Amino acid sequence: MPTEKPTIIYTITDEAPALATYSLLPIIQSFTASSGINVDTRDISLAGRIIANFPDYLNEEQRIGDALAELGELAKTPEANIIKLPNISASVPQLQATIKELQSKGYALPNYPEEANTDEEKAVKATYDKIKGSAVNPVLREGNSDRRAPLSVKNYAKKNPHSMGAWSADSKSHVSSMDDKDFFGSEKSVTIEGATEVSIEFVGKDGAKKTLKPAFALQDKEIIDASVMNKAALVAFFEKEIASAKEQGVLLSLHMKATMMKVSDPVIFGHAVKVYYKDVFAKHGQLFNELGVDVNNGIGDVYAKIAALPQDQKQAIEADLQAVYETQPPLAMVDSDRGITNLHVPSDIIVDASMPAMLRSSGQMWDPKGKQKDTKAMIPDRSYASIYQAVIDFCKENGAFDPTTMGSVPNVGLMAQKAEEYGSHDKTFILEAAGQVQVVDASGSVLLEQDVEEGDIFRMCQVKDAPIQDWVKLAVTRARASGVPAVFWLDASRAHDAQLIEKVEAYLPEYDTDGLEIKILAPLEATQYSLVRIKEGLDTISVTGNVLRDYLTDLFPILELGTSAKMLSIVPLMNGGGLFETGAGGSAPKHVQQVEKENHLRWDSLGEFLALAASLEHLSVVTGNAKAQVLADALDKATGEFLDKNKSPSRRVGELDNRGSHYYLAAYWAKALAEQTVDADLAAEFAGVASQLAESEEAIVAELNNAQGPAGDLGGYYLLDDALVSSLMRPSSTLNAFIDA
């Protein structure tokens, strides 16, 4: 993107971070303007991505460019400097709600066809399917991941410890996984020798062949693997664990990643729904089929589809659903007051966030009466479930961790170029018949094959060699910079990991590792090793694949800091650019609900502050813009003062919220710029701003807090009304006058 000035791209996303952007971005643009830095935006919100992908259905004024595709290309260039805020990884219900809202605003978009029969329906469904799930991150992540808690954040957590639930040695909470016929148990893996093309073929019991995925390119030295989740074994697992939860008197919960693993995990979730509510499906299954109920969307889909039935028929089915709770173990609740259970929609309980929350709360989740209770956490596949059981066992023996003394676990994650499971969606298939699935190369040789039954889930993953080399290098770099042990979380008894271990052992000698402690441990042992060190106040770098990158950058920050949104998340892009992610949390729909109810936004923008400082520092290094480094250093100082003076948003209406926190950041940033002695021009420019912001503190905070209370009109949920939200998020005329001057 050739421009005269170096450009930072600030992404427009969804829900709470999107609202916060209306308040914070004008401050960022104002503070950076005189330093020759462009801060531009690109809309990668769910609504924006839908609009961009259906130009043929829209009129000229409604059409917008495909910002995500543009940023994907930018990420491959040395100029890339992208600040990426959390966005919605859409489930089908969220996708449908967005389409409905856009249609109501005059966008003549097609409905999402759950059953695609015609060619047009198939094309529409294919386009929407590309937008759902975690469609954004894999496009932008052209590098590996470096995530850690900045010192200022860690020190704040030690001085202001978050609550940690006490643990009992008698806790009945535990993780349950399959012991056979899951992805872990069936995995086969091979390293490619020489670039080739492969296709994925199904061969039926009768010998008939069907191409599941046409030929696609593989690079030399690429690792590929294939695994199968057996449907019959999965269903038997759910039946056994549901009975066991009842017998043990614990809550039943299911922890999946249906947003990212958008092909496999909703299907697994659907099987759990059908087994738990089996009496209702046995009685009303035919009607549900006629109504188009999709269990993969959760039991909420039953409620949605029966809503239009005659009142007595609807009430009879609802009574049957309620009766299930009399005979089955109680479900963990998402919202006890509204009766929303773990099985309501697949996007409500997401393993990387839900398990750490449970572990922080004495290993308990909420029951239907709104009380915390010991819980069985079902994580069907064994690949990574042991890490959570290890934390449960450790806390039962040693008690809860102490945030004032505990160590940290920064992460170096293998992520680039759609590595491993998180790039497998287009190679994941639900089999319609029994037979074999084969990965066949250009010469007709079968590289990998798996026996399958009807309904099984087949998955192929890949990871390229260049990202692995970059990952090993980043691990050594971080170990050297921080002086703490680095542990590769790889299991030699797992097919894919065995291939990776060979590469790690081959590439490590290429770097200077003298004096560094570098280990390779299976996830269970790596967790145990790290937990002992955490308890002793010691730090340990976790060097992991893509899924554990995701899981651990929630698990340890939530235990250490109370949230994963306060992590510094840097993606050094492989072609020299930088991607700066603002925390590892989601987009906080409940925060938006509070704004709609009482105009109070409790979103904490600390992740944005940290990412912006890292982005400015990167810009300074790459372009030689010395002012950018001064801005970054001053912002770091301001963030430290912001934390020390506890200016993060309150949860309560009438108190400081997101907007007030932005005022304090601006005031402290201006002060730090005015006081620094590296750049006299910036010091002079911000001296007046700093004194004006400081002197007007009382007036500005009053204007910001007094705006709260009445309902906040956003003019939409997925597609916000710019003018309305800008005015709502910038209610202080005093502050605006200084920022816009």
Where are these regions (language model features)?
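Short, charged, amphipathic alpha-helical segments
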Residues: 683-691
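Extended, well-ordered protein cores
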Residues: 2-270, 278-503, 507, 511-523, ...
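C-terminal accessory extensions/subdomains outside the catalytic/core fold
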Residues: 720-741
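A generic structural micro-environment signature
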Residues: 269, 710, 720-723
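Ligand-binding pocket scaffold of soluble enzyme catalytic domains
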Residues: 674-677
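A glycine-biased, small/acidic residue-tolerant capping/turn segment at secondary-structure junctions
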Residues: 701-717
